[in-house]
Every structure is written in structure tokens, then in C-alpha cells.
Amino acid sequence: MPPLIESVVLQPLIAPIDPGFDGRRSRRIERRSFARIKDAIDLPLLIETQLKSFEWFKREGLRELFDEISPITDFTGKNLELHFREYTFGEPRYDEFECRDRDLTYAAPLRVKVELRILTTGEIKESEIFLGDFPMMTDNGTFVYNGAERVVVSQLIRSPGVYFKDEKDPTSGRALHTAKLIPNRGAWLEFETNKRDVISVKVDRKRKIPVTILLRAISAWIANEDGSGRWAPDNELDKYGHNEHLIELFRHVDTVAEHLYIQATIDKDPSHNAKEALLELYKRLRPGDPPTLENARTLIESLLFNPRRYDLAKVGRYKLNKNLWERDARRDGPKAPDLSVRVLLPRDIFRIVEQMILLNNGYGRPDDIDHLGNRRVRTVGELIQQQFRVGLLRLERVVKERMSLQDPASATPNGLINIRPVVAAMREFFGGSQLSQFMDQTNPLAELTNKRRLSALGPGGLSRDRAGFEVRDVHHSHYGRICPVETPEGPNIGLIGTMSTFARVNEMGFLETPYRKVYNSIDNAQVWREKGILLRDVRDLRTGDLIAAKGTRVDDQIARQITIGLLRGQILREDVVDPNTGELIAEAGTEINRALAERIVNLPMKQIKIRPVVSQEVDYLSADEEDRFVIVQANAPLDEHNRFLDTTVSCRFGEDFVTERVERVDYMDVSPKQVVSVSTSLIPFLEHDDANRALMGSNMQRQAVPLLRPDAPIVGTGMEYRTARDSGQVVVARRDGVVVSATGNRIIVEEDDGKRTEYRLRKFMRSNQDTCINQRPSVVRGQQVRAGDVIADSSSTDQGELALGQNVLVAYMPWEGGNFEDAILVSERLVREDIFTSIHIEKYEVEARDTKLGPEEITRDIPNVGQDSLRNLDERGIIYIGAEVQPNDILVGKITPKGETDLTAEERLLRAIFGEKAREVKDSSLRVPNGVRGKVIDVKVFSRSEGAELPVGVNQTVRVLLCQKRKISAGDKMAGRHGNKGVVSRVLPMEDMPFLPDGRPVDIILNPIGVPSRMNIGQILETHLGWAAARLGFRVATPVFDGAHEDQIKDLLVQAGLPADGKVTLYDGRTGEKFDHPVTVGYAYMLKLAHLVEDKIHARSTGPYSLVTQQPLGGKAQFGGQRFGEMEVWALEAYGAAYTLQEMLTVKSDDVVGRVKTYEAIVKGEPIQEAGVPESFKVLIKELQSLGLSVEVLSADEKPVELSDDLDSDIGALEGINLSGMERGEF
């Protein structure tokens, strides 16, 4: 035995952190930051996308829809016209708290003013119509729908517009190009080139036709620049669309003699002019219908030129212009149509064919469909608008039908409008859409991530079966827009992503990311004068002071002022020479003072070249805008005046990483963390972790269950406060003021204007995932708060910071094989001191309904139940709050009338003699499920008689909330933030854990073999830094890609009086002997994940059986058995365990008679009889017989064996012994 270790005074884990709290200002955790780069801008509100989008829908989206559908006319268009005018939202009937309690939808009444015009008399009838209760978004970006919080996830889809793609011809190897014209709503046009140089088109996915047929037909449509148009008169149709006309139109592009595309297509085209082409097109699109000129024109107009049937949307027109009209550098060419033109123009289609010919001839490049310039985000407002449009179109159909049936003179708006289609459309969307999701509320981070998610799935998107590798892969255009790390593992990988920290969605739906503008030259006064009005603020490049505000009209004086302000303090990159006299004004390298700036501003030169300087100006760029610029990363070294220290820097240009001279740089990243999502930016030392493990770390943080006493991490990244604040789970002060009262369930703040605001706290509320939401005040009476301060913590926050786990002392060492294969050994201290204890709240509900035999009743008077089982029920038959319950205890007593069919002959006789008194009832009480125990914390009763809104046929609903306190135990899943996950294998007594030289036992033992192959070294650096910071009594922030370096960690370890390598000799707690080698020890932040052993463990002896095969059901939810499959049978065969195998396949499974007799034999202690015929064998024979095969079963002596066809003959054997927990009538 080694000598006893001398006693050492234990230093506290973390010294109390006091940020100079004087009772007046808000207390916040202070962190020592290792960041060297300051973010150029603050993080935006992290749920801004959701809030802004819904606001847009309320303000503009609905207005667009009503304008689109107005006026609704009758089928003749001569009698009635219905116009939708202004609309208003009323006040919601209940607030969000009540809606959650009562299982209602948080919604506001939508009313719209409607005007009915009777065209025959000129009379106008006005009325205000109620269009249903419209679900409203809460301040946290969620919807409360039927009592549950839901989130509408943004959808990432292919943007409307035209896309060019190349496909190799397998025989010749030539690149043949195709084009797809995708509208927001309406018919698709798909163009393709074949190897014989014929260009064909598919209209609305119908048959292929030569493109010249379409070109000839639309050449007769005379379009105006606003999108409206008309057909050429009948007698002139012959003059349009001749061969010479078509060849002339494409002469400038169709220039390769070996491949004359238009001529090859004309040769395949049976028509010769617009008239013939219209008829031919109609024949191809509507085969079987008689082709007339009128029908053909109506069809083409409705397919391509009618705004009610074809809509490119503003974004579609923007992409079309960009791809067709702005690709071409010719200045003298036709101008692009206006963005308000949302239908096709004939020249768009001609231009697509032109572009295809150019691509086929080797000019230009096809589009990259996975580029974010070609994919846009449909946010919540647009998704709701789309669904509301469906409802309005259904309503329009109803209105038109009613208009044709009613007398115009007596028609009223109320009589014409039926709101049911609109209400049903919204119910479909919020209740059943793939994009309206039950919010992940496990912890605040899960909630926030759910609101920032981008899904490529859903209506109009991809399906996970058909999505290939390319669409799932990380693309260079994702930089700063979509996180390259955070995505699910499994079939949805790459199809579901998360917005990066600084990303936002622009008005077109494209993702943008911010960059700091780099100035290489300054515009002289005459250039500023030409700009007329300033479109942005102009600020001093050194100080950031305002020189001229946005919207200022630029005259001579202001233009001079701007140029001088920007030039002052800058260094010239080239000599400045007066163009008129040739006089040298200043040499390169001169710093510009005011006098020099005033001389330069008078020179007749447009730009002054300066040494590049990174300004405070921030531009948000979309992916296709970014491709034109050279962008340097945020870590490029700058001096105190924001000039580059190096002459060349590493930059991004398009998809390439290049080294460029600083003069060529256009922009700089605003922050090192702008690449990743919020969840990923919470991983310290992310840059030292392999991407696969970082992905797991990001995903597992969202699964961390809230613990009893939240503890913010010692080693954070500085993102903890903002994440918690914007998640919606903490309470944030709306305005500045002073706290006048702070109790457990409410905080009252007196604002500066004397008005008092009350903040209600959520106490022990159940989340969607059965975790506990409990808000606690983090302010005291008399404390000053500012708008945006966190005034109450939630279950996973600590002083306003995200706190998903606990700081624990870990050692990386093997221990008796207990941490083999990533298993985790934990100390009993974590159990005893409730360090990893979590609260879980489960909801149980029972309804008393009207049945055919009479109403169900909630009562204490339950047949065949002893007094002991009723001890916790009140006089109503409902369990009281505070009762501790075990599996199978009654929560709510309920009886259901029994049907006549259930009565025996004796019972029917008694019924006939005594009447209703003898009426039998069945016990249908709500009981605690198997494996569940806990304490009742809330009971709610909703009765129709008391005015509660209940579903049809329900008289009363009782809801019971059961609370469980779960300590950490063997089988629970734990993880760090670096993807280092494992299952607790054993809880060791504190005295058996290895201990430090000062006598302190470690809390957790992790396996060192789990580190090298996983390449997540971040966990080791976190452990070292955590130990040093804990000893020195402060918390640290080590931001991603800008965190602490190895030498800084070593210095801190030495400063804390710890070994520089972070390793220490440990002693075995059982023997007191030293371990052979020093061990890495330190404080790591560990999470307990939502995969708890208590939810997973399950055992069955007898239980329910499948109806057809009579085999036990599967899964814990069905109280199922363990499947003994084909491979397991092979294993027993290999051992020759014949009797065990026979039992498995018969009495333990589907030998119906045998299993009852076996059960009986075991109970009575008799020998077990031989097994019978399994039910699945009978099923197999029946299946073979159903194929028309005559199948007989013969015994060993070749005599036929009779197999009973149904269970009736076996039921005699089942009398008295119920293996399944079913009533006899339920077989």
C-alpha cells in the first residue's frame, strides 16, 4: 500500500463570479474570451425569418391574394361581380397560455369587406364577412394549434425560372443541351436537342413537338411590355411564322454550318405559318378534340399568357431576366422585361431557343441546379399564402355556382360566400402538412433550431427516395448561408439543413449572408454627384462616423464633403497626377490629410486608388451575387486602421480558394462563425473536431434533457446567451424599467413611463417531448432591467445562458473493461447529489363519450375493484394532486355501459325481472401504463355542462399530468459536445472511483481509445481548459475558428498550478495504489440525452397476440415479445438445442393450445406436455390452398392429420386462463 496522501485543501470548482452586481443592473455570467477577431455586426434576431415572414403575410400576402381573386364574376360575366376589399384581424379569444391549457388554437378572427355589384342595375351591396379564425404566430415564432406548439419549417425548393442543362449523347459524345422553364404556377416548358439537331419542346409534360410549331404559334401573339396582349386578326395569321422569318430571327446564333438547328427543326415541322401551327399545336395537346382556331388560341393563351393560369412570380421573372436578358453583354439588345410582368412574353421563349443554340455551339455554361442562386426559401408566410390561395380558389368555385343559381337582384355577399373551403384548407395545412411540424421542445436549442430549419422535402419539393447524392452534398454557395455541419444522419442527410448564424432570407426568397466592404479606391465628387440620391449611409472608413445619411440628395457641396470624408487618413496606392497639367500632386504611400483631400477632390478624375481598407459597411449578398466578388476570410490580419498587413491573402472566388493581392479583394467575412449554424457554433474547439463527429455533436445537443439544476458550461463559445435569449424559452424584458415584484410565478416591471408590465412565468409545464419547462426569476426587486435583458431563466438556462448539461470532472482511462466500446462509468455522487437528475412530465387523458348504449360515466363506483385501488381517488373518481402512483393504478375511474351481446342468459333473465337496476357496466378506467411511476402534479377537468369546447360526442375530458424524477442510471445515453457519445455501463460508489493526489474522486471515466480514431480532439482541449478555468475561478469563451490556442491553454494550466500537459497521477479508489501512467483529467461539459433507459426497457411473460398468425406482437408500445428470427434459429441449430428451439417456435410463440396448457402446467407444477401445431403453419397451408393447391398434412405413418380451421375449437382450452389481457369476445 502506498503511504497515505497528505491532506490538501480542496479548491472550489468555480470561484463565485461577481460581475460587480450592485443590485441595480442585471446579473450576467462574465466570460474571459479568447477571440482575436471582433464580429463586424451583432447577430440578427435568430427567429427573425419566422416573425418577418408571418408579418409580411398579414400585411401584404393576404392583400395579394384578395387582389388576385377579385373580381369573382358569374359564368356569363354579365350579372354579378364580387370584390374583396380591406381585411382586418380581430383580437384572439384566448391567449396562448389558455389555448395550451384548453387544447385550443391560438387564432384571431379574420374579417374582410366584400362588395357585390349587380351589373344589370348598377346596385352595389357591401358587407363584412367573417372568413374563419386564422391561426396566429406567437412572439416566439410558433403556432399553438389544438393545444400543441407547432412550427412551420421553411422549404428550400428550386426557384421558378429557366434552367439549362447539358446531357452527353452516348453515341457521338456531343454535349446536347436541354432547358426547363419552371413557373411558380402553371404549365412547364421543357426544351431538348436530339443528335439530329432537332430542338423539341414538351408543353405541360405532354408529347414532344418540334419547337418551331410553338415559335410559329406564339409569333401571332402581339404582346405589350406590361404582359397583356392580343392575337393577330384571323385574316393576318398566314403572315406570321414563316420559315424565312424563323431562320432570320436565329441567323446571328445558328452559325455552325454542320449543325443548323432551326433548319433541322423546320424539316420536321408539318406547319408553315402561325395559323397551321396553332391548329397543329392544339391537335398535339388535345388529341381527340376537334381542332378549331378559336379553341387553339384560347388554349395557348390560358397555358402561357393568362395571369390567372400562369404565374412566374416576381422571383421567376427576376431569374428569367438574369438568365436570358442579362447574360448577354450586348448593350444595344432589347431590354429585360419589368419585374412586374409575371407571365411569359413570346420573346422570352425565342430567347430560350437562342440560348440553347449558343450552348450547343459551345458558348456559355449550363446552370448548376444545386447552386443556392437557383434554390430559394419558401418561408412560413409564403407557405400559408399558397394554402390560403387553394382555399380561396375552392371558395371561388362555390361562389360562381351560387351566382348561377340565385336571382341577381336578391343575391347578397353572405348568401354567396361559404367559408368552409377556406377553413378546411388552413386546417389541412396546420394539421397535416409535412412542413407544419410538432415543435421539438426537448430544450431551448432544439426549439430554436426547429425554427431555423430548411427542408428540401414537402409538397413541391424532393422526395427522400429520389434525391441523389449531388442535391444532398455541401456546395460552395452554402458558405455563410446553410451550415455545412448540421444535418440529420440517415435517409434525410443533406435534405434537411439549418440556416447559418448570420444568414437571412431576402424578399425574393434567396439566402443572403453579410460581408464587410473592402475599399480599394474612392469615387471622386463628380461620381457622387451623378448618383443623385444616396441609397445607403456613407461613413468614415476609419472611425465609422456618419458623413451623409441614406436618402440625402447629393449636390456639389455634399459630393465634396463625402469624398473628403472618405479620403482623410487613407494612404495612396498610386501617384496622383493632375490630368490637365501633368503635375505630381502626391506620391504613392502618402497619407491623405484634409488639405491634400481638398486638392484631390478638385481634380477631373473619377477614382482615387488607395491602399485597401476594410470598412464597417456591411452588404448582404445572395449566392449568385457573391460569385462575382473576391472575398477574404475574417481571420486575415489587419492593422489598427483596418488595412491588410500582408500583400497577398487567401480568398474565395466562386468555388475556388485562391491567393490574391489585397488590391483585388472586394469583401471580407464579418465573423469566423458565419459559416456554421447556431447549434454548431456552441461547440468549443470545433476546428479540432472531424466534421462527422461535429455533426453528431450538433445533433445531440438538441437531445439534451433539461436537468434539475442547470449549470452553464465553464468552457463556452460566447453564443450561449444569444441562443437562450432568442429561443423563446426564457422571459425577456420588453422595455427598460425597474423590477417592483419578482415571485415564483410572475415578475412585474415598472417601466420608465410609469406603466407596469406583468410577465407570467411557466411553472412545471410539460413540453411536446415530455420534458419539463419551468421558468425561474433571475432578477430581484429593485433591480434595473433594459429592453432585451433575460429576466427569468428556463429549465436549460443559467443566468440567461444556455445550460444543457453539467460540468463534471472526467478522466480518460480504461477501468476494468467498464468503459469498453464507448461505455461510460459514472460516480454515485452524480446520483446522490442529483447532478444529472431530470424531470419528465407525461400527460394522460380520458374522455367520457356518448355511446350507443348510453353515456360513459366518470365515477368512483367501479365494479370489481377493491377499496385499496380507490384510495387515491376523490369523490368524483379522479386522482388527487400529489398522489404517488405505480403501474396499473387507477388515475380516473370510468365505467362504460355493456352491450346486450355481452350478457349471459342468466344476466338477461335478471335484466328482464329487475329492469335497468341490473344493467351491467364495464370498467374502462384510465390506468397508469406498465413501467411508469410518478407523482400527480396537475389534474384538469373539462365538462360540456360547464361550457368547455369539446369534440362532438364527448361530455367530459379529464387530463392528468404525471411527474417523474429520473436520476442518471446504467443504460442512459450521455454525450459531450464533440460527438463523443456513450451509454452508462455502471454507477460506481464514490469511494471506488479513481482519485486525484488531493483526494478528490473523478465523476466520470471515459475511454481514451474513443478519441484517436474519431478525431474529435476538441474534447481533450476542452478538458484541459476546463480544469484550468475551474481552478482559476472563471468561465471562458472560445469561439469557433477563433478560439484558444494550445500554448494559451498550457499557460493557464501552469498559472492554475496544474501540470502543463494536463495529466496527473491518479490513485485507484479500491486499493489506494497509483495507476501506472499519468491520466488526462479535467472538467468537461457532459449532457444527458433524451434516450433514457426507463423509456426503453421492457419485459413480457404473456401478452397480446397477432390476430392472424397468433404470434406475440412486437415493440414496447404493444407490450410485445422479443423476436426470435431466422438467424437466431440457425444459432440454436448450430448448438443442437432441439428442445429449446421447439419451445421457441411453438409454446413461446403461436401454438395456441400448447401455450395455454404450458402456462397451466407451470402454475400447477405439472410436467409440460408436448407442443402442438403452430398457428403460422396453419396460415401457410391456407395461403397455399388459396393458390388452388391441394395441401394435406400427413402423420409419420402417412395418415391425414385434421387441423382445426379456426380458433373456436381451441377456445375451450383457453377458458379460465387469459394470456393476453383481452376479454373473451375480443379474440
UniProtKB/Swiss-Prot annotation:
It comes from Chloroflexus aggregans (strain MD-66 / DSM 9485). Keywords: DNA-directed RNA polymerase, Nucleotidyltransferase, Transcription, Transferase. DNA-dependent RNA polymerase catalyzes the transcription of DNA into RNA using the four ribonucleoside triphosphates as substrates. Belongs to the RNA polymerase beta chain family. The keyword Ribonucleoprotein does not apply. One of its GO terms (cellular component) is DNA-directed RNA polymerase complex. PROSITE patterns: RNA_POL_BETA (PS01166). It comes from the Bacteria. Its EC number is 2.7.7.6. This is DNA-directed RNA polymerase subunit beta. Pfam families: RNA_pol_Rpb2_1, RNA_pol_Rpb2_2, RNA_pol_Rpb2_3, RNA_pol_Rpb2_45, RNA_pol_Rpb2_6, RNA_pol_Rpb2_7. InterPro entries: DNA-dir_RNA_pol_bsu_external_1, DNA-dir_RNA_pol_su2, DNA-dir_RNAP_su2_dom, DNA-dir_RNAP_su2_hyb_sf, RNA_pol_bsu_bac, RNA_pol_bsu_CS, RNA_pol_bsu_protrusion, RNA_pol_Rpb2_2. One of its GO terms (biological process) is DNA-templated transcription. The RNAP catalytic core consists of 2 alpha, 1 beta, 1 beta' and 1 omega subunit. When a sigma factor is associated with the core the holoenzyme is formed, which can initiate transcription. The keyword DNA damage does not apply. It catalyses: RNA(n) + a ribonucleoside 5'-triphosphate = RNA(n+1) + diphosphate.
